[in-house]
From Swiss-Prot:
Disruption phenotype: Reduced alkaloids and nicotin levels associated with a lower putrescine production. Occasionally, an early senescence and a lower viability of the older leaves is observed. One of its GO terms (biological process) is alkaloid metabolic process. The modification N6-(pyridoxal phosphate)lysine is found at residue 96. This is Ornithine decarboxylase 1B, chloroplastic. SUPFAM superfamilies: Alanine racemase C-terminal domain-like, PLP-binding barrel. It catalyses: L-ornithine + H(+) = putrescine + CO2. It is found in: Plastid, Chloroplast. GO terms for cellular component: chloroplast; cytoplasm. It comes from Nicotiana tabacum.
Length: 433
């Protein structure tokens, strides 16, 4: 499911994190244990670029293949931010966002649980030594074979939003606990809305609760998802209010007391996260302050993944048309850059002119030109950037793309024989500058 991980020699990872998290098992050690290795590179945060240059010059002189750098320090920082802003909400990381094994391992070591959407994702998480009680099978419409597998391995918490799903679960996994997935009335203007596909409408809540009750299934709570990427935090307010109404409806039907609220995903790091956390806590206080025993979970994906990964690509071709510069790189829309199409992402590139301008590899102060950057495949759709300003570069120079952890390699293909799954990941641990 994920590519190879390369660990570059450095200090003992347990020592690196000791002062950061204060004893106990080291998340970095857990991450580096993948493939039986135990070392990462400790860096100041502003030294990541130098680290990437060292990889380019020392490790990839001949291959010149694209690679990722996973900054474990950024992951630790993001988990600290989560625990500070939402201390009572336990994250179930959305595996679909980025299943890199070292990344999942460090999240697990720091206490994250996992949101899986398929048998394959469940198998993958279990293969990392993570117990099934730390998984929510958060797909409201599952193949029967996947439900059978979940029952077999002990994944006992799942979502539903249709009567047919009730019948499948009753038949194949009657001990499962259910979360009724509801549709938020506002999708938050998210780049990737979830409402058109998933979530019970208000008028469907009562029949769906009754269906589960008649099937003698336990409905433990409610889930929702306001959509992914740049969602309006106000959408949480209405969704949490609607969830409270479902709790009340279940109580009126004489069902067992609901104990779980899943506030879904849609969280983005930075200022938007701060705003979202305030909105979520405000709504929880307003609607669930009388539920002290309530377990609250969330399904963040991009919050943890997006800024932790940086992608480096090689320029493999060049064409000049007047002032226009056109470059081909060895990753594109059918690979890591599929986020441009499917996640509606905007990517940014930084040059590393290791061949053409070694005395000024970042090309600081250099003249820039309107530039088009193409991916490597033969499809004209495979265009990463248009009308983008870049300096004069040459074949075998590099373009580096930050913030490439969310819905990138995870959804890439091997179209035209360009093997996305073969892109390697190097590990580093950065400290704040």
């Amino acid at each position: 499911m994920a590519g190879q991980t390369i660990i570059v020699s450095g200090l003992n990872p347990a020592a690196i994190l000791q002062s950061t998290i204060g004893g106990g098992a080291s998340p970095t050690a857990a991450a580096a244990a993948e493939n039986g290795t135990r070392k990462v590179i400790p860096l100041s945060r502003d030294a990541l670029q130098d680290f990437m240059l060292s990889i380019i010059t020392q490790k990839l002189q001949d291959e010149k293949q694209p690679f990722y750098v996973l900054d474990l320090g950024e992951v630790v920082s993001l988990m600290d931010q989560w625990k500070s802003a939402l201390p009572n909400i336990r994250p179930f990381y959305a595996v679909k966002c980025n299943p890199e094994p070292s990344f999942l391992s460090i999240l697990s070591a720091m206490g994250s649980n996992f949101d899986c959407a398929s048998r394959a994702e469940i198998e993958y998480v279990l293969s990392l030594g993570i117990s099934p009680d730390r998984i929510v099978f958060a797909n409201p419409c599952k193949p029967e074979s996947d439900i059978i597998f979940a029952a077999k391995v002990g994944v006992n918490l799942t979502t539903y939003d249709s009567e047919d799903e009730v019948y499948k679960i009753r038949k194949h996994h009657p001990k499962s606990e259910l979360l009724l997935r509801i549709k938020p009335m506002l999708d938050g203007n998210a780049r990737c809305p979830m409402g058109p596909k998933y979530g019970a409408l208000p008028e469907e809540v009562d029949p769906l609760l009754r269906a589960a009750q008649a099937a003698r299934l336990t409905v433990s709570g409610v889930s929702f998802h306001i959509g992914s990427g740049d969602a309006d935090s106000n959408a949480y307010l209405g969704a949490i209010a609607a969830a409270k109404e479902v709790f009340e409806t279940a109580a009126k039907l004489g069902m067992s007391k609901m104990t779980v609220l899943d506030v879904g995903g849609g969280f983005t790091s930075g200022h938007q996260f701060t705003t979202a956390a305030v909105a979520v806590k405000s709504a929880l206080k307003q609607h669930f302050d009388d539920e002290p025993e309530l377990t609250i979970i969330a399904e963040p994906g991009r919050f943890f993944a997006e800024t932790a990964f940086t992608l480096a690509t090689t320029i493999i071709g060049k064409r000049v048309r007047g002032e226009l510069r056109e470059y081909w790189i060895n990753d594109g829309l059918y690979g890591s850059m599929n986020c441009v199409l499917y996640d509606h992402a905007t990517v940014n590139a930084t040059p590393l002119a290791v061949l053409s301008n070694r005395s000024n590899v970042t090309c600081g102060g250099s003249k820039t030109f309107p530039t088009t950057v193409f991916g490597p495949t033969c499809d004209a759709l495979d265009t990463v950037l248009r009308d983008y300003q870049l300096p004069e570069l040459q074949v075998n120079d590099w373009l580096v793309f930050p913030n490439m952890g969310a819905y990138t390699k995870a959804a890439g293909s091997n179209f035209n024989g360009f093997n996305t799954s073969a892109i390697v990941t190097h590990l580093a641990y950065s400290y704040p500058s």
